[in-house]
Amino acid sequence: NTGQCIPLNIIAQEFVDYVKSHDLDPEKTLLWMVSSQIACNIGMFPHHLRSLLNSYGKGMEKAQVYVGAMSFMDISLRLPINTYFAYMFGGLIRKIGCRIRPYEKKMGTTDRVIQEGVDILVDAFLGKRSKEEALADVISSFQRIEISSERKPKVAIFGDLYVRDNDVMNQDLIRFIESHNGEVIVTPYSAYAQMIARAYLKKWFFEGRYLEVLSSKALLATVTRMQKTYQKHFGKILENPAPQYDEDPERILSEYHVRIEHTGESMDNLLKIFYIK
């Protein structure tokens, strides 16, 4: 790796492994990578992946790297919305798990319900049943878990985007905190996107990237309206109504002498700290 927050060598290796395990012709395959000018030097990711595949050889140099929009709008108009809700559902299920597991009376119950819930929601995203119906069933299962009334110190996890919720990379940090009598606060990526959206929209406007601003604002408005249907179910266990992330980012950042023109996870984390404190 060359210092990126996302280990590109792992992405390239997983692509190679997938092509091999499914006996695909590399010349007829594409590795998707985001086109972006945000932090972490993401703009060079496609080029570096191309170099990694060329270096690997063995036919993989014939595979292509497809540079696509972060929203996936160039693939399908429905895909950005489904992607957002996949992150929302997954993130909030993880948050519920962290809320309940430290207090469960029968150890292992929460993890079992999480796994069963994920399986149910996968079917919903595959179109086999209604998402709202599936979510209602999952939340009911969580509500049936017997828990104690004690309260433990809460610990929020900050840090690198890739490592924060990756149990392998962070060495099972959540279980470590829970084993030392803590309750972990995690942030779903859907909430994280809402927290930082206003700052990036302003930044892109200043940079003259008006099309990105318009398309992103339209997508944000759509998912914000649609998620109210699902939030009422999550609200039976988590906060209801859902938190609002509509404070002026310039005011928040100015306390730390950071400007809208700055970018990166340090800026993002300042906004996150403000909203979850």
What is each PLM-predicted segment?
Residues 1-277:
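An N-terminal assembly and electron-transfer interface module characteristic of large anaerobic redox
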